[in-house]
């Protein structure tokens, strides 16, 4: 099957899932894209350098959520210089994995500092992905220096479709 056919097939499966679950297509598509980015992160040389946190961690725990999330929250155990983060995310975008129809656009990566208050500074990464010509905005917020208690453990993130699931730190 060609890359175009795989993308179209995956897109149709996501559309079917959204209809079956009564959820908006864009929401399910966004979750799929975030899941496949996490899968690439798990397969990358940086897999042990990031810890999943936030709303997607609640998804992994299958906890109820009040609203859908549109971004990935990570705790970074890497150099927090913007150029370095851009290189790391770009490397993850290009990790070779089993065909899943998603393409992450390394050239679209933009990084910026985020300041929630005087004691916290993180990095926001924005880029986009495509699936069968559908453009998917991606956002990752990376915090640094947070204490995680108890320490992080490996989890298997739930897969929307019958594709290999990400195994990552959380």
Regions found by a protein language model. Give the residues of each.
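Compositionally biased terminal segments of proteins
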Residues: 1-170
């Amino acid at each position: 099957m060609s890359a175009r056919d795989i993308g179209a097939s995956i897109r149709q499966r996501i559309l079917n899932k959204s209809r079956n679950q009564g959820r908006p297509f864009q929401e399910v598509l966004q979750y799929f894209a975030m899941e496949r980015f996490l899968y690439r992160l798990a397969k990358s040389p940086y897999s042990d350098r990031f810890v999943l946190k936030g709303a997607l961690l609640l998804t992994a725990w299958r906890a109820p959520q009040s609203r859908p999330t549109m971004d990935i929250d990570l705790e970074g155990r890497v150099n927090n210089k913007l150029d370095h983060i851009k290189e790391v995310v770009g490397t993850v975008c290009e990790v070779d994995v089993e065909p899943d129809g998603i393409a992450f656009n390394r050239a679209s990566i933009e990084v910026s500092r985020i300041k929630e208050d005087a004691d916290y500074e993180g990095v926001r990464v924005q880029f986009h992905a495509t699936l069968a010509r559908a453009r998917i905005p991606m956002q990752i917020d990376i915090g640094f220096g947070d204490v995680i208690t108890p320490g992080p453990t490996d989890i298997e993130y739930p897969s929307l479709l019958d594709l290999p699931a990400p195994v990552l730190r959380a």
